[in-house]
């Protein structure tokens, strides 16, 4: 005989279910408002309606568009986009995918076990910021590399995958919205869900709107982290502490900023010295205070002789190492650009036409010596070195005819 055992929840506490239903209802109502708008421009206006005006007005096009990232992080990936735009290389989409997946943010996810509600909020915000930065990078690829067919097709497909409620960003956004109290953060929930309903065309064309979103999300997320009791020095990387404290000062959290400034000043001052050393230092200060000022510089006196510079021959010179040079994100584009720079070109329209003709003449001379002998070499050199009529007219001196005198 088979027994079927069923379990039921006989508890009368429905607070958890009601809270979950309320969160689903809030997210569902916001999604219905965007789904009811057919045109992409209407969805964009609905998103702008819930975005406050930034204090500095519209953001610049070349400003940092990554959330919780330094200027150096953003410049590194932006130079990679410029590298793709300059070098017409046969690039593998898998290489772009690897670069996109390496984009993160300076907010660390929490690794504490078991996690507290503040740790869950920190991890959710970190994941949303990382996926938002990857979406922004893909949108910039689509915007700036519009003449590269393969890059455009890859960026269009990636934008379609990364937009929508069923994407990876949509899953993380809904998890973050479930952790927020909707009564206090209704505008933030509306903006987060509104991001998921924007079209790929909007992401590729509205670069300034992305800067507007970045400014709002940074301030809102920083408010959430501070109100949850998290410490800035523990949740952010060390290179982002100064930027985080600057934003805290702008949004009004002056207490933590003053404490951080006092800590930085005490660390810069070093450990206090003994009382005897302090007394000796005070005596030295008194002597310097009462001593006569230093005499002014006399212009008639000969100045100190400068150390002579030693010239190094060209073959012994070493190339200067540029420590601040950014790494190349796409090596294949770098190799293609180097090949294009090394390829000889002939042009008499610009100012370097003579030098390029000399280079071509030298190449033809060596080729003629190998094939036909010295006579053909001289002929080829004479033909190659002959400038164009425009150059000849520019180099020929203008002389007036001389009329003979009759005596």
Swiss-Prot record:
It comes from the Viruses. Keywords: Host nucleus. It is found in: Host nucleus. One of its GO terms (cellular component) is host cell nucleus. Residues 273-286 have a biased composition (Acidic residues). Residues 268-330 are annotated as: Disordered. Belongs to the HHV-5 UL34 protein family. This is Transcriptional regulator UL34. It comes from Human cytomegalovirus (strain Merlin) (HHV-5). The gene is UL34.
């Amino acid at each position: 005989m088979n027994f079927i055992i069923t379990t039921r929840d006989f508890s009368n506490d429905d607070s958890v279910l009601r809270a979950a239903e309320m969160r689903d209802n809030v997210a569902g109502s916001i999604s219905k408002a965007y789904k009811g708008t057919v045109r992409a421009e209407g969805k964009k206006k609905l998103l702008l309606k819930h975005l406050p005006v930034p204090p500095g007005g519209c953001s610049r096009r070349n400003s940092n568009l990554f959330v919780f990232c330094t200027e150096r992080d953003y410049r590194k990936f932006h130079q990679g986009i410029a590298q793709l735009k300059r070098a017409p290389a046969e690039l593998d989409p898998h290489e772009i995918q690897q670069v996109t997946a390496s984009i993160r943010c300076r907010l660390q996810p929490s690794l504490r076990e078991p996690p507290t509600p503040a740790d869950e909020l920190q991890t959710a915000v970190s994941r949303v910021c990382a996926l938002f930065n990857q979406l922004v990078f893909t949108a910039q690829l689509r915007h700036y590399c519009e003449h590269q067919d393969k890059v455009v097709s890859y960026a269009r497909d990636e934008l379609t995958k990364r937009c929508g409620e069923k994407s990876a960003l949509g899953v993380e956004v809904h998890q973050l919205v479930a952790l927020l109290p909707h009564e206090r953060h209704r505008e933030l929930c509306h903006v987060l869900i509104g991001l998921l309903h924007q079209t790929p065309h909007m992401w590729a064309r509205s670069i300034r709107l992305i800067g507007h979103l970045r400014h709002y999300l940074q301030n809102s997320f920083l408010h959430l982290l501070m109100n949850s009791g998290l410490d800035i020095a523990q949740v952010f990387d060390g290179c982002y502490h100064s930027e985080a404290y600057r934003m805290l000062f702008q949004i009004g959290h002056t207490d933590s900023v003053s404490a951080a400034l006092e800590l930085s000043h005490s660390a810069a001052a070093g450990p206090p010295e003994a009382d005897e050393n302090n007394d000796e230092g005070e005596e030295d200060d008194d002597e310097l205070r009462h001593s006569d000022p230093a005499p002014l510089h006399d212009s008639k006196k000969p100045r100190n002789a400068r150390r002579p510079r030693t010239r190094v021959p060209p073959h012994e010179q070493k190339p200067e190492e540029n420590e601040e040079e950014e790494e190349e994100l796409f090596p294949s584009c770098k190799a293609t650009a180097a090949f294009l720079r090394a390829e000889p070109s002939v042009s008499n329209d610009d100012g370097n036409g003579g030098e390029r003709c000399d280079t071509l003449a030298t190449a033809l001379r060596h080729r003629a010596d190998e094939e036909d002998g010295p006579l053909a070499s001289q002929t080829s050199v004479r033909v190659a070195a002959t400038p164009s009529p425009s150059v000849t007219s520019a180099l020929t001196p203008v002389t007036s005819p001389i009329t003979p005198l009759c005596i």
